[in-house]
Regions:
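Helix-biased detector of long, well-ordered alpha-helical tracts
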Residues: 1-197
Length: 197
């Protein structure tokens, strides 16, 4: 009964509900753009696998929740880098570089600068460079998207290869706390760069 309650709660969690938004993209694009790479290159994982002669490139992108960008611009900037790095590492890769797209209202330069500051802080802490991007300060709203390129030299850690009886490892920093009223923990902004890297 307890497990059933947990499953039901997770199924209606805002983080899970928002995954439904991926369906239109999944219906539009090829599910296996690099078929020669097999299951590891199928879309829907934490990062895209792109063929390269020595090792494989990983690519990922995250759009940040508009309400987070609006209410917490610095933390949105920080999070945009963190979630991208997490996606690359989750697939066994090393982050190489990031790019961003920021849309904001020119009358709110402070918000724009806070987003940049949050991204810059995360880039320094994780030692991953922001190598370019796009800014538009003539928008009636604020929006943020960040993309990352990574490299994997060993096996790709893809959920497609999971099997019954596999061990599941969860690596967690138990320090930190929930961030304000949001349903996620912040265990990284105050952690040392050495621990995070």
């Amino acid at each position: 009964k307890m497990l059933d309650k947990l499953i039901k709660k997770l199924q209606t969690h805002s983080g899970i509900e928002s995954k439904k938004d991926i369906q239109s993209a999944a219906k539009t694009f090829s599910h296996n753009p690099f078929s020669e790479l097999g299951k590891s290159a199928m879309i829907g994982d934490d990062a895209a696998v792109i063929p390269k002669q020595s090792g494989l490139l990983l690519m990922a992108s995250e759009g940040i929740s508009p309400s987070l960008v609006e209410k917490e611009p610095w933390f949105a900037g920080w999070s945009s880098v963190l979630v991208n790095i997490s996606d690359i590492v989750a697939m066994g890769g090393k982050p190489l570089a990031l790019v961003n797209s920021i849309w904001s209202d020119k009358s709110d330069l402070e918000k724009h600068n806070q987003i940049l500051s949050g991204m810059s802080f995360a880039c320094e802490k994780f030692n991953v460079p922001m190598v370019g991007g796009h800014s538009n300060q003539k928008s009636p709203y604020s929006a943020l998207s960040v993309s990352i390129l990574g490299l994997v030299d060993g096996p790709v850690l893809s959920s497609r290869f999971a099997e019954a009886e596999d061990e599941l490892w969860i690596i967690v920093n138990k320090d930190g706390c929930y961030y304000k009223d949001y349903p996620f923990r912040d265990a990284a902004t105050k952690a040392s760069a050495t621990l995070l890297r």
